[in-house]
């Protein structure tokens, strides 16, 4: 009886572990993640895909160039050049996401502020970019200046609340950004 209980216990642990880690790298490099929980690892679709719904947290959420819609798109949500729509687009979300070509609409499209990169990177540039297009909100000077100017001081409808995500750390990208 003791052995069978131990076996059942070990099987349960194995299943729980496999189930927990199954979200890691969900979508891998270029796929899409749809549904409630796409977090961990490269999270919601890795490099290039899109994340829709629920919690798309974990690193690189939204991937490089993809889009993050709804819920919580966690670290790097929105990625480089993608869009971040609704909910909380977390660390870097709307930063590179809104900054380098994409848009950040609604919720908190934050990103950090780094003294070494005061204007162009990390979420605040996203707010600046939105200031040009859709009207940014309270980011750094870009977010306040351009967002306040063309966004009528309030971010122009869906400008959101900039500058409340993570901190820009160039080492994460392994290079010159």
Swiss-Prot record:
Please, which domain of life does this record's source organism belong to? Eukaryota
Q: Where is the composition biased (Gly residues)?
A: 149-166
Q: Where is this region: 5 X approximate tandem repeats?
A: 25-112
**UniProt KW keywords:** Repeat, Signal
The positions making up the signal sequence are 1-18
Q: Where is this region: Disordered?
A: 149-177
Q: Where does the record place its sequence repeats?
A: 25-41, 42-59, 60-75, 76-91, 92-112
Q: Does the keyword Signal apply?
A: yes
The identity of this protein, by name, is Eggshell protein
Task: State the organism of origin.
Answer: Schistosoma mansoni
